[in-house]
């Protein structure tokens, strides 16, 4: 597939999927289902560019392999090909279906594309509470209103949402922990008898490598294209290589 598509100029997300042949069909099936069509602001361009399929891969990475967190699209797919299994993809598939059934099309202002892997991780923690999925939708609705500016350890949904990065591990950790804390408080989920709900940002070497990437994105946004994304940066890097 990679050889046949050399002249088509596949983007980063599309090329990355060629590194995960075992689960590629499953990933495509999930990305083509109702959550991406109904529960977020659907974009045909994003679908054609493989961005929804990449969101599925990042969700599996976040939910099941966060200790080995990878940032790049190719690195994620390469890792999952060797370390994931069909049960993990089936579980994430179920989570997408349950969120869609609970939220329908009423939470699009919160369930934005850049945060899909974060919300799948938060939902995986919600599932452990045993509450009905409608309660998760109640929380998302509340986050659209009063909770969006509520402070948690110096940050809020609004402040995190303004950050330009989407895959920086420090930012992903902050979002998961902040949104989970807001959810637990709003739904009165008792976590005292369970292990900590917080994920940790313990990969120092990777974190140090992430900062230059964030600077690159910020530089491009400030000096060339204010709408540039991290996927654009990855695509340009691939072209140079």
Which role fits each region the language model picked out?
Residues 77, 93-100, 137-144:
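Hydrophobic core segments within long, regular secondary-structure runs in both alpha-
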Residues 152-208, 213-219, 223-240:
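Acidic, carboxylate-rich catalytic segments that either coordinate divalent cations
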Residues 75-89, 96, 109-115, 119:
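Small-residue-rich helix-loop
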């Amino acid at each position: 597939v990679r050889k046949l598509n050399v002249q088509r100029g596949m983007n980063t997300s599309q090329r990355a999927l060629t590194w995960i042949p075992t689960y590629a069909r499953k990933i495509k099936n999930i990305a083509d289902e109702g959550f991406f069509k109904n529960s977020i602001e659907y974009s045909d361009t994003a679908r054609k560019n493989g961005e929804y399929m990449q969101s599925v891969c990042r969700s599996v990475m976040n939910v099941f392999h966060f200790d080995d967190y990878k940032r790049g699209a190719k690195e994620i797919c390469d890792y999952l090909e060797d370390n994931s299994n069909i049960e993990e993809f089936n579980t994430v598939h179920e989570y997408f279906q349950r969120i869609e059934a609970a939220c329908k099309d009423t939470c699009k202002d919160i369930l934005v594309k850049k945060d899909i892997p974060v919300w799948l991780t938060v939902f995986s923690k919600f599932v452990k509470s045993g509450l009905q999925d409608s309660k998760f939708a109640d929380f998302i609705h509340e986050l659209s209103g009063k909770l969006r500016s509520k402070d948690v350890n110096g940050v809020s949904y609004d402040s995190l949402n303004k950050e330009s990065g989407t895959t920086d591990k420090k930012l992903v950790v902050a979002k998961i922990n902040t949104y989970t804390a807001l959810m637990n408080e709003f739904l009165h989920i008792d976590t005292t008898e369970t292990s900590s709900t917080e994920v940790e940002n313990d990969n120092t070497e990777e974190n140090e490598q992430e900062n230059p990437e964030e600077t690159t994105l910020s530089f491009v946004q400030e000096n060339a294209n204010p709408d540039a994304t991290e996927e654009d940066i990855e695509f340009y890097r691939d072209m140079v290589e």
